[in-house]
A protein has these predicted regions:
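Extracytoplasmic gating/loop element in the C-terminal half of outer-membrane beta-barrel translocons
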Residues: 50-142
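Outer-membrane beta-barrel transmembrane strand signature
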Residues: 1-46, 91-114, 118-121, 125-133
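C-terminal beta-signal and terminal closure region of outer-membrane beta-barrel proteins
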Residues: 81-91, 104, 150-184
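Strand-connecting loop/turn motifs
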Residues: 38-41, 131, 138-140, 173-175
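Surface-exposed loop/turn segments flanking beta-strands in extracellular/periplasmic regions
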Residues: 7-10, 64-75, 163-169
Length: 184
């Protein structure tokens, strides 16, 4: 990894440090709810998104490129690592067993866009007509299927864009429910 002499004094030091990226908390958030019902069928969904937000990958994502070789290597680290064939098109430093502690210092190399759009909730259901339920002495009957966090569009790819960038938190789980609601 090469660092740029931003102030032009011929030295790479703390005077070359600059703010990079966007804040951890997004500058813009958005959400949208929609739904409809027709002849007993119903459908609803909720979308949410965050924009102009960045994550600086924590040491867990950088250590394999430095001097500590006791960490697992993730798929992106191998695919994106520098090789003579890739040259300047590589997105990550060369993997090495030698001391390369400068490879995991804070820099825009480890900065990722954490903007995303996520399908937070989707539900499809059917309510049976009361004329069919009277004989069974049932007031209402609805079957449904719902899902949470099933789809996310983002360029972060390393972990969940909503989770803590330290890599120590579980990502949001995907949930699918099937249900039956009976009223008497």
């Amino acid at each position: 990894v090469k660092y740029k002499d931003l102030n032009g004094d011929g030295q790479i030091d703390e005077k070359d440090v600059r703010d990079i990226g966007y804040p951890k908390y997004p500058l813009y958030t958005a959400g949208m709810n929609m739904g409809f019902s027709w002849k007993g069928f119903d459908f609803s969904m909720t979308w949410a998104g965050a924009f102009k937000t960045s994550r600086l990958l924590s040491s867990m994502y950088r250590v394999p490129f430095g001097e500590s070789n006791n960490s697992a290597v993730m798929k992106y680290m191998i695919e994106d690592a520098w090789t003579p064939e890739k040259g300047n098109s590589a997105k990550a430093p060369a993997l090495s067993f030698k001391s390369k502690s400068h490879n995991y210092q804070d820099s825009d190399l480890w900065l990722r866009d954490a903007s995303y759009v996520r399908l937070k909730n989707i539900e499809v259901g059917y309510s049976f007509p009361s004329s069919l339920l009277k004989k069974a002495h049932i007031g209402s009957l609805r079957i449904f299927m719902s899902g949470y966090n099933l789809l996310t569009f983002d360029s972060f790819k390393v972990s969940d864009p909503e989770s803590d960038p330290s890599g120590t938190a579980y990502p949001l789980i995907k949930v699918v429910n099937v249900g039956l609601k009976v009223g008497f």
